[in-house]
C-alpha cells in the first residue's frame, strides 16, 4: 500500500510490454500522475474496486461505494436507538473506495438524526491486530457502544474484540463483502448484515474494456458500476 511501490509496479508492467493496465491502488497524487503519463503514451488504465477519480483513467469498474455506505447507514440507523454511540472503522483513508463508503455512511446517519459526535471513527489499515485494538479500546472507553460499522477488512478482528469485552449480541455489527469468514460470522449472529459486491465482474470486465479500447477504438463510459445491491443476513447468506 505504498504509492511508490505501485508506481514501480506500473513501470515494470510497461517495460514487460503491457499495452493497457487494470489498477486497484491508493488514491495518491504520484499514482494519478503516472496514470496520466501512461495515458499520454497511449497506454490506457482501468481502475477496479477502488477508483482514482482525479486521474485520467479510462474507466472505473466497481460498486457505487458511496451508495453502499449509505445503505449501511440506513441499516445502522434502524438498528440503533436514537442517541446510541456508533464506531465506524475504515481501512485506509487514502483508498477512494474506503472513503466513499465512510462518507456515504456518515451522510445517511446524519440524515437519520445521528450527529457527527455520535459517530466515532478509526483507521485500521486493513490489519487484524489494528482492527482488534481499535474496537477493544473503543469498547473500554465507551462500554455503552451500540453499533460498529466496518468499511474495512478483518471483520473477525472486530468480532473477537467484541467477544473479549463480553458484548457479543449486545451491539449491532454491519460490514461489507462476503467470504467464508463473514458467512460464518453471519450464521452465528456475530455480524448482523453485510453488503456484498460483484468481485467477478471487477476482475472480468477490465481486460475486455482495455481490449475494446486498444483494438476497436471503443471507449467505455467513465464508470461501470454494479447494478442492484443486496443485503445479506443469516437468513439469506
Predicted segment positions?
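Flexible loop/hinge segments that line or gate small-molecule binding clefts
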Residues: 30-67, 179-188
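A conserved helix-loop-strand patch within extracytoplasmic ligand-binding domains
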Residues: 68-86
Amino acid at each position: 500500500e505504498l504509492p511508490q511501490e505501485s508506481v514501480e509496479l506500473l513501470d515494470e508492467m510497461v517495460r514487460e510490454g503491457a499495452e493497457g493496465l487494470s489498477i486497484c491502488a491508493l488514491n495518491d497524487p504520484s499514482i494519478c500522475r503516472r496514470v496520466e503519463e501512461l495515458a499520454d503514451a497511449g497506454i490506457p488504465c482501468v481502475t477496479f474496486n477502488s477508483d482514482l477519480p482525479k486521474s485520467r483513467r479510462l474507466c472505473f469498474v466497481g460498486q457505487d461505494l458511496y451508495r453502499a455506505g449509505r445503505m449501511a447507514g440506513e441499516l445502522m440507523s434502524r438498528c440503533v436507538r436514537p442517541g446510541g454511540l456508533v464506531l465506524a472503522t475504515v481501512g485506509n483513508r487514502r483508498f477512494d473506495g474506503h472513503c466513499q463508503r465512510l462518507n456515504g455512511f456518515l451522510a445517511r446517519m446524519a440524515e437519520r438524526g445521528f450527529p457527527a459526535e455520535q459517530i466515532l471513527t478509526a483507521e485500521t489499515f486493513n490489519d487484524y491486530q489494528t482492527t482488534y485494538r481499535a474496537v477493544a479500546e473503543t469498547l473500554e472507553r465507551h462500554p455503552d457502544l451500540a453499533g460498529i460499522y466496518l468499511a474495512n477488512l478483518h471483520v473477525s478482528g472486530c468480532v473477537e474484540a467484541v467477544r473479549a469485552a463480553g458484548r457479543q449480541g449486545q451491539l449491532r455489527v454491519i460490514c461489507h463483502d462476503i467470504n467464508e469468514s463473514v458467512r460464518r460470522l453471519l450464521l452465528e449472529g456475530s455480524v448482523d448484515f453485510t453488503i456484498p459486491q460483484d468481485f467477478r465482474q471487477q476482475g472480468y470486465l477490465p481486460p475486455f474494456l482495455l481490449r475494446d479500447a486498444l483494438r476497436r477504438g471503443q471507449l467505455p463510459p467513465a464508470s461501470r458500476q454494479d447494478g442492484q445491491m443486496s443485503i445479506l443476513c443469516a437468513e439469506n447468506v
